Amino acid sequence: MKIITYNVNGLRAAVSKGLPEWLVQENPDILCLQETKLQPDQYPAEVFEALGYRAYLYSAQKKGYSGVAILTKQEPDHVEYGMGIEAYDNEGRFIRADFGDLSVVSVYHPSGTSGDERQAFKMVWLEDFQKYVTELRKTRPNLILCGDYNICHEPIDIHDPCLLYTSPSPRD
């Protein structure tokens, strides 16, 4: 089974920049997307259905913000939207699809780079996410976590390495 994760930074823009052609070339069984930045009624279903993919989207309440998706060639047995924590679920950050005893997650972690408040939100999120995954693994041990973790441990992890030590978390 081939699984790919991809932060598209806007799904509609990614489609116009060649995502469907790339998808044909790579041919994953499952594609986990982050930062879809669209509402369900904006999803270009015909593009992906023509390639044999079913889509499961979880959008943020705020339009044009965040959002995750799982595109799959095989219909999942179950899809879980969110972690059951309203503050996070309102931002469309977590979706899980179960295929038999295998679970695949697409997650978009908060970045925390826009200021102290969002950095604090991110730190609480990371703690809650860890607790959630620990509990989930008790019933779904075959768990694949895909996503954008918004963690820049090394210069290679950021698009502009000069920014690595200017955002809140690396400075602390």
Residue ranges and their predicted role:
Residues 1-9, 101-113, 146:
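Active-site-proximal beta-strand elements of phosphoester/diester hydrolases
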Residues 2-12, 22, 26, 40-56:
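Internal alpha/beta domain cores that form substrate/cofactor-binding pockets in large enzymes
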Residues 7, 23-41, 104, 133-155:
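Active-site beta-strand/loop signature of hydrolases that rely on acidic residues for catalysis
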Residues 36-39, 44-112:
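Structured beta-strand-rich core segments of catalytic domains in phosphoester-bond hydrolases
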Residues 85, 110-126, 164:
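Surface-exposed cleft-lining segments at the edges of enzyme active sites
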Residues 119-140:
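A long, amphipathic alpha-helix that forms part
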Residues 158-163:
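Surface-exposed, charge/polar-rich loops and edge strands
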Residues 165-172:
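Conserved small/polar residues in nucleotide/adenosyl-binding loops
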